[in-house]
């Protein structure tokens, strides 16, 4: 009797284990992996289910879905001329991935630029100035950076308006945020040859939700997107383009 009970208990445990690893849960036919959500397969299903979760298409999509570079300079230039329409297509592709609607206002006011350096793949950006009010002295800006793309190093100096002070928050992806203020940070990403030398040697990785501010008025700074691209909000004093100074004197906005 005892022997039969032990055999039944063992068989029951085996069946429960098999059910768990084949993904049968209280949610119906969904697998453990799909029910658990992104990045939690093995924790929810147990180590024996690792292969099951790795082979599950939904789980693999959730774990691996990251935006990556799709366009290069071969797409962005034709006979040496910057193709703004292609650059906009690239930006819209990134927006679609991140679930950012392309609004009528964006269609009207959004711009893309290679800053005249002929290397949009690596040095360039898209953006919208939501507001730039000289009377009340405030500015709101969306920064769009494709994977690996950098804004040329620059500073904002005083004109008839005060020197621009600014803050940034990452909405999607992440960026290297560089400043000339602070000690040199090791293991910096390579700066594109088309940009040339930089003054800003201190940087931090700025992730989604992180808010950083310009460390000092009129100091040089720039940001570079990571391999997933980035969408960044900027808030600042009034932006006077006459006060914009690039390290690379060939660059212009």
Q: Language-model features: where?
A:
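N-terminal Sec signal peptide cleavage junction
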Residues: 21-24
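Bacterial N-terminal signal peptides that target proteins for export
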Residues: 1-10
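Double-stranded beta-helix
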Residues: 182-199, 220-253
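A short, N-terminal "cap"/entry segment at the start of jelly-roll beta-barrel domains
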Residues: 64-139, 193-194
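Glycine- and acidic-residue-biased ligand/ion/polar-headgroup-sensing regions
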Residues: 146-147, 163-185
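Short beta-strand His + acidic residue motifs that chelate non-heme Fe in jelly-roll/DSBH
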Residues: 152-154, 160, 177-178, 213-214, ...
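A short beta-loop-beta micro-motif enriched in histidine and acidic residues
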Residues: 130-140, 153-166, 219
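Secreted, short cysteine-rich peptides and small extracellular cysteine-rich domains stabilized by multiple disulfide
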Residues: 31-63
